[in-house]
Amino acid sequence: MKIFAYGIRDDEKPSLEEWKAANPEIEVDYTQELLTPETAKLAEGSDSAVVYQQLDYTRETLTALANVGVTNLSLRNVGTDNIDFDAAREFNFNISNVPVYSPNAIAEHSMLQLSRLLRRTKALDAKIAKRDLRWAPTTGREMRMQTVGVIGTGHIGRVAINILKGFGAKVIAYDKYPNAELQAEGLYVDTLDELYAQADAISLYVPGVPENHHLINADAIAKMKDGVVIMNAARGNLMDIDAIIDGLNSGKISDFGMDVYENEVACSMKIGLVKNSPDAKIADLIARENVMITPHTAFYTTKAVLEMVHQSFDAAVAFAKGEKPAIAVEY
């Protein structure tokens, strides 16, 4: 049996070598190149392909992969919105993803960023860099004094709620599919409008499905408290970034944190320097002292990388054996 992997990063290699040592009977080959119509031929002779990329898995790419006899595709990440499922269905692709690799990684990151926004650490860091040790006017706020609205109470959202409880914050939550334990605690509000009206800070943990596109838009922001803090480490398309910028300009939004961006594949968050980005909004946001940006690295811990590699390769082997792994994508 042979597995071919695309887009293997240097930081993934230790986890891959660990997996190979535990599975010596499996032949593994890989490249740092991403899966494209041109690179699909590299997988010829393999039973499964393991991938991770923000580039789309287009009809052309899937056709090229199927033409070299590979129709088992195992993603090392959770998102599947960049797959042409019509083409995948046409070629009978088996697809898996890694829906749960480390909820703690993303939840911790988002809560740390929210805490930093409340304590105005970016402004303080800028002052320190200028050798300015004066306190004012960078007064912070305590997490325990905030009502924090959590939108989405899946694996990550629930970890975030536990962290918030540790801080002593009042937590309210909204989810179309409530968790029974959280419901018993009385944390849920009935509508997003209720959450918007009550929350001092809002953090999102919902998928980037079409119904959630620009969930946070001008209408939603207008319903929020004045001076609301918004943190998004879920999916970039949840934010209408123009509405966010307008909210920051008006002061309706006091602080904003994001780890994901709607156009991140095309901008410098993925491909290089900010000055080379085709999207001027990134430079605008980065320059603001009340905005904190990370380049889609909320997940990026040693534990998460290990799980993403190990689970995806395990699924690739299962597909090659004609089995259905627990993390197979139903489509």
Swiss-Prot record:
The active site is at R235, E264, H296. The keyword Flavoprotein does not apply. Keywords: NAD, Oxidoreductase. It holds the Pfam family 2-Hacid_dh_C. SUPFAM superfamilies: Formate/glycerate dehydrogenase catalytic domain-like, NAD(P)-binding Rossmann-fold domains. Gene3D superfamilies: NAD(P)-binding Rossmann-like Domain (3.40.50.720). It comes from the Bacteria. This is D-lactate dehydrogenase. It comes from Leuconostoc mesenteroides subsp. cremoris.
